[in-house]
């Protein structure tokens, strides 16, 4: 699985066991992701942060 880094022109291949890509947004600004990468389990959203997860190459 390949996931985009913070700047989507760059990406990395995920290590074994991390089979989801994610992007994280601050709830105050849902237009600009503040973090992207590979993850094993999609975190729950909170009052401050929203996560969007997916499982295909460079989907984040």
Curated annotation (Swiss-Prot):
Its GO biological process annotations read: killing of cells of another organism
Tell me which family the UniProt entry assigns to this protein. Belongs to the three-finger toxin family. Short-chain subfamily. Type IA cytotoxin sub-subfamily.
Disulphide bonds in the chain: 3-21, 14-38, 42-53, 54-59
What is one term from the GO cellular component aspect held by the record? other organism cell membrane
Say what the protein does.
Answer: This three-finger cytotoxin is a basic protein that interacts and penetrates into the cell membrane, with the tips of all the three loops. Cytotoxins which have a 'Pro-30' (P-type) interacts with membrane stronger that those which have a Ser-28 (S-type). CTI interacts with membrane weaker than CTII.
The name under which this protein is listed is: Cytotoxin 1
Sorted keywords for this record are:
Cardiotoxin, Cytolysis, Disulfide bond, Membrane, Secreted, Target cell membrane, Target membrane, Toxin
Compartments annotated for it: namely: Secreted; Target cell membrane
**Family matches, as InterPro entries:** Cytotoxin_Cobra (IPR003572), Snake_3FTx (IPR003571), Snake_toxin-like_sf (IPR045860), Snake_toxin_con_site (IPR018354), Toxin_cobra-type (IPR054131)
Molecular functions per Gene Ontology:
toxin activity
Q: How does it assemble?
A: Monomer in solution; Homodimer and oligomer in the presence of negatively charged lipids forming a pore with a size ranging between 20 and 30 Angstroms.
Question: Would you say which domain of life the source belongs to?
Answer: Eukaryota
The record lists the lineage as: Eukaryota, Metazoa, Chordata, Craniata, Vertebrata
What stretches pass through the bilayer? none
- Is Membrane given among the entry's keywords? yes
Query: Where expressed (tissue)?
Result: Expressed by the venom gland.
Q: Which Gene3D superfamilies match?
A: CD59 (2.10.60.10)
